[in-house]
Amino acid sequence: MPLNKESKQAVVAEVSAQVAKAQTVVLAEYRGITVGDLTKLRAKAREQQVYLRVLKNTLARRAVEGTPFAPLAEQMTGPLIYGISEDAIAAAKVVNDFSKSNDKLIIKAGSYEGKVMDKAGVQALANIPSREELLSKLLFVMQAPVSGFARALAALAEKKQGEAA
């Protein structure tokens, strides 16, 4: 069903608002994917706060015009699904993880910090641990010396009590 001018403007405004807040945009070709699989992808995207949208490439080009993602316009050909996220790696991770289990979803390109990435670049970005994972690893590394010191003190106190008895 063709969109009228007002609805096209509304779509461009909605996508432009998402792009303005985004750190990452990922494009993937979805030719041949079933509705059920696409629904699963959308559910995973929602869980990760990734804005996922199938839209006409001309409207997508208008939405990214004048943003750091404008160079992606050259890659916008064919049936594409757009993953847009404020988190630097969430969109890449959602699309990459889904493409591993569904060979019909083909990562085409992406953009992060104004740089256009090919499929390998998007996959590399997706393999970076999330902020939460990195913070938990940092916390573990910071706690290790303290907990080791505490165990040594406890062992020393136990030894002293054993000698006193």
UniProtKB/Swiss-Prot annotation:
Classification via InterPro entries: Ribosomal_uL10, Ribosomal_uL10-like_sf, Ribosomal_uL10_bac, Ribosomal_uL10_bac_type, Ribosomal_uL10_CS_bac
Keyword rRNA-binding: yes
Keywords annotated in UniProt: Ribonucleoprotein, Ribosomal protein, RNA-binding, rRNA-binding
A cellular-component GO term for this protein: large ribosomal subunit
A Pfam cross-reference name: Ribosomal_L10
Domain of life: Bacteria
GO MF annotations in UniProt: large ribosomal subunit rRNA binding; structural constituent of ribosome
One of the GO BP terms on file: translation
Bridged cysteine pairs (disulfide): none
Function (record text): Forms part of the ribosomal stalk, playing a central role in the interaction of the ribosome with GTP-bound translation factors.
Stored NCBIfam families: PRK00099.1-1
Family affiliation: Belongs to the universal ribosomal protein uL10 family.
Quaternary structure and partners: Part of the ribosomal stalk of the 50S ribosomal subunit. The N-terminus interacts with L11 and the large rRNA to form the base of the stalk. The C-terminus forms an elongated spine to which L12 dimers bind in a sequential fashion forming a multimeric L10(L12)X complex.
Full protein name: Large ribosomal subunit protein uL10
Gene: rplJ
